[in-house]
UniProtKB/Swiss-Prot annotation:
<keyword id="KW-0408">Iron</keyword>
<feature type="topological domain" description="Cytoplasmic">
    <location>
        <begin position="1"/>
        <end position="29"/>
    </location>
</feature>
<comment type="function">
    <text>Heme chaperone required for the biogenesis of c-type cytochromes. Transiently binds heme delivered by CcmC and transfers the heme to apo-cytochromes in a process facilitated by CcmF and CcmH.</text>
</comment>
<keyword id="KW-0997">Cell inner membrane</keyword>
<feature type="topological domain" description="Periplasmic">
    <location>
        <begin position="51"/>
        <end position="165"/>
    </location>
</feature>
<keyword id="KW-0479">Metal-binding</keyword>
<dbReference type="GO" id="GO:0017004">
    <property type="term" value="P:cytochrome complex assembly"/>
</dbReference>
<dbReference type="GO" id="GO:0046872">
    <property type="term" value="F:metal ion binding"/>
</dbReference>
<keyword id="KW-0812">Transmembrane</keyword>
<keyword id="KW-0735">Signal-anchor</keyword>
<keyword id="KW-0472">Membrane</keyword>
<dbReference type="GO" id="GO:0020037">
    <property type="term" value="F:heme binding"/>
</dbReference>
<keyword id="KW-0201">Cytochrome c-type biogenesis</keyword>
<keyword id="KW-1003">Cell membrane</keyword>
<dbReference type="InterPro" id="IPR012340">
    <property type="entry name" value="NA-bd_OB-fold"/>
</dbReference>
<dbReference type="Pfam" id="PF03100">
    <property type="entry name" value="CcmE"/>
</dbReference>
<protein>
    <recommendedName>
        <fullName>Cytochrome c-type biogenesis protein CcmE</fullName>
    </recommendedName>
</protein>
């Protein structure tokens, strides 16, 4: 007896074999789609976690909150290097960033950019230390006399403390 004849003998209506096969295909397809969606969800979750850890929010001294100063979160601090505030001790550079409303003391360990100087725009990347000082691990200075980072320029213009381009 052939396989089809055996199926028909067990299932006189002849539907069982075909119906089971279609049902199994649908179930298999649903599992594949569900698995692909689960993998996609995990990938998106990992990407968002990585982006969240790498995002560095921009703040001026007047924008800072108590949470910014105590959370240990990394962000970018922007403003102008206050006149008379720069001091060097070995490889440590200390200076004050201001937006003319508030000031923040910054400590940077390393060599500052060539164009770093008092009265110029600066963006420092880092976090606040337990001592209340902003610990920068990267300092960016303007690269010509007309350049101020766009975020910094917009923020300073909103506060009415800068009138540049």
């Amino acid at each position: 007896m052939s396989a089809t004849a055996e199926q028909n003998a067990r299932n006189p209506k002849g539907k069982g074999g075909f119906a089971r096969t279609v049902s199994q295909r649908k179930r298999k397809r649903l599992f594949l789609i569900g698995g692909a969606l689960a993998v996609l969800a995990v990938a998106v979750g990992l990407m968002l976690t990585a982006f969240n850890q790498d995002i560095r929010f921009f703040r001026t001294p007047a924008d800072l909150t108590e949470q910014d100063m105590t959370s240990g979160a990394r962000f970018r601090l922007g403003g102008l290097v206050e006149e008379g505030s720069v001091s060097r001790t070995g490889s440590e550079l200390r200076f004050t960033v201001t937006d003319t409303i508030k000031t923040v003391k910054v400590v940077f360990e390393g060599i500052p950019p060539d164009l770093f100087r008092e009265g110029q725009g600066v963006v420092a990347e880092g976090r606040f230390g337990s001592d209340g000082l902003f610990r920068a691990d990267n300092v960016l200075a303007k690269h010509d006399e007309n350049y101020v980072p766009k975020d910094l320029a917009n923020s300073l213009k909103k506060k009415g403390v800068w009138e540049g381009k």
